[in-house]
Amino acid sequence: MGRLKQCWSSLLVLAVLVIGTGAVPITYLQSAVAKGAVCLDGSAPAYHFDKGFGSGVNNWIVHMEGGGWCTDVASCNERKGTMKGSSKFMNKDFGFSGILGGKQSTNPDFYNWNRIKVRYCDGSSFTGNVEAVNPANKLFFRGARVWRAVVDDLMAKGMKNAQNAILSGCSAGALAAILHCDTFRAILPRTASVKCVSDAGYFIHGKDITGGSYIQSYYSKVVALHGSAKSLPVSCTSKMKPELCFFPQYVVPSMRTPLFVINAAFDSWQIKNVLAPTAVDKGKEWKNCKLDLKKCSAAQLKTVQGFRDQMMRALSPVHSTPSRGLFLDSCHAHCQGGSAASWSGDKGPQVANTRIAKAVGNWFYGRSAFQKIDCPSPTCNPTCPAISTED
């Protein structure tokens, strides 16, 4: 009896520890495989689902995981052996925090919603849709099908009754949230309040240090390889080249669903890959600067400041529309809503004396609008982290 009691005590402690970490088990969507909705390697798509409760039982956050893109067979093949290209390598449990957090103290507006993290394994921001599978490389470019299969599954699990819903994401997942935002709105009940949140997904059609646009050629390869054109918003592709419709600044003007953009003006991923990508930095003069802005020369800092100017212009469709929200800090960071510390913590970034969680919550519920742009230099905001962060 004593041993049984001890066993139950151990299980109780273990349960408390698991609940305390916010670990949410993985769900493999095996039924999607027959529809051809699969990861790069052909494995089933996956997500983590923490059910809502209390007043949040009919409210839903669907959060799209980030993780860059693959532009050719070689880079996509590399992903096949990792969680970025196969659900076989994904961690079985995922700790929810930040915008997905389940604690009222750190996520007061959304803690009891149905919270879903959609895993990213297609390399196309959930836009790929190529029917043919090359027998030589056995790569599947089916991101758009994965997206639809996951949404259909969630609808069957109760999202069809949603009263409030948010489609959000980080980085490449945040771009997906923008690209699929209006479609998400159309799927849900007409009476539901549906909005979208992009965290570090506002990738700009910017110039690099040579005066060219490396990122445009990069996105062109993504769109061509994955057959993304037919999955991008028609309101954009009817006016310009499909690869340009990977840039939010060309998609947002015709979006009908309210959008909140969380971004760093000195986005660390974009400084490294839009402004000073290794491919154009032949002499590696930017190697140290782009990792730590404190190591930039005066001339480099001027160029970095010019990148912020490009960001400001690209964001004009956001701050020119009252229904949209904007939290643009001057941090050297990328994805700031994924941890409790940066989402709502005492030491998290602030703009206009407001933390991200409060800004997004107030905007979603219509308590107050929020379109705030931080001070202009990369060292002006003392609430920014001391070192570059990429959650």
UniProtKB/Swiss-Prot annotation:
The EC designation for this entry is 3.1.1.-
Q: Keyword check for Signal, yes or no.
A: yes
- InterPro entries with a match to the protein in the record: PAE/NOTUM
Q: Which GO terms describe its biological process?
A: cell wall organization
Principal localisation: secreted
> Which subcellular locations apply to this protein?
Secreted, Cell wall
Instruction: Name the catalytic site residues.
Output: S171, D267, H334
Q: What class of enzyme is it?
A: hydrolase
Q: Which GO terms describe its molecular function?
A: hydrolase activity
Identify the Pfam families for this entry: PAE (PF03283)
Knockout-associated phenotype: No visible phenotype under normal growth conditions.
Task: List GO terms (cellular component aspect).
Answer: extracellular region; plant-type cell wall; plasmodesma
Statement: the UniProt record of this protein carries the keyword Signal: yes
Signal sequence, start to end:
1-23
Q: Give the keywords, sorted.
A: Cell wall, Cell wall biogenesis/degradation, Hydrolase, Secreted, Signal
Q: Which family does it belong to?
A: Belongs to the pectinacetylesterase family.
**Function of the protein:** Hydrolyzes acetyl esters in homogalacturonan regions of pectin. In type I primary cell wall, galacturonic acid residues of pectin can be acetylated at the O-2 and O-3 positions. Decreasing the degree of acetylation of pectin gels in vitro alters their physical properties.
Q: Can you say what this protein is called?
A: Pectin acetylesterase 7
Q: What organism does this protein naturally occur in?
A: Arabidopsis thaliana (Mouse-ear cress)
Which gene is annotated as encoding this protein in its UniProt record?
PAE7
